[in-house]
Amino acid sequence: MKTILITGIGGLTPRSIAKIIKEKHPDYKLIGCDVDKKAMGFFMKTKDGRQLIDEYFIAPRCDRPEYFPWLERLVTEKKVDYSFVEPESEIVEWGRYYEVNRKYPCPTFMGCRLLSESLRDKAIMAELLEGTEFIPKTIKVTQKNPRFEDVEKKIEFPCWIRATEGTGGL
């Protein structure tokens, strides 16, 4: 039996990863962690009603100094074989950890740190994808400069306003 850690388990991608692993390898032990104590509340059952995650831990924020010591203890205590790292903010920090330590806390599956740097800020991502078919018309607004006239003329109402980072940026 393998033990797999999935970070950011409250997010859609980590839950999807967990569902596939549970479906293909029901004997694997899945450990989830997230900074949000409510992350385990939604969509955490398999199709046949089993728990998606075997153990759940509330993690320190990945940009805090206590994150990696906490994570290293978890990997050791739970005998984690592999980790799947999400979301982009954690990928960036794990990438930095690797640059300093020349290793990850355990064998790891994750995206590219440099790409994740741009993808975690939805405004930067919109700038990179501007003019392609991969993103709808986009205008950067702020609370200080809401640009209502530009939104009305260029995008039109109704429209969707998103946060550039975090769960509001999903």
Cite the ranges covered by each PLM segment:
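ATP-binding N-terminal substructure of ATP-dependent carboxylate-amine bond-forming enzymes
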Residues: 1-109
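Residue-level detector of family-conserved "landmark" positions at structurally sensitive sites
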Residues: 85, 111, 137-139
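Active-site nucleotide/adenylate-binding loops and adjacent lid/helix of ATP-dependent enzymes
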Residues: 116-170
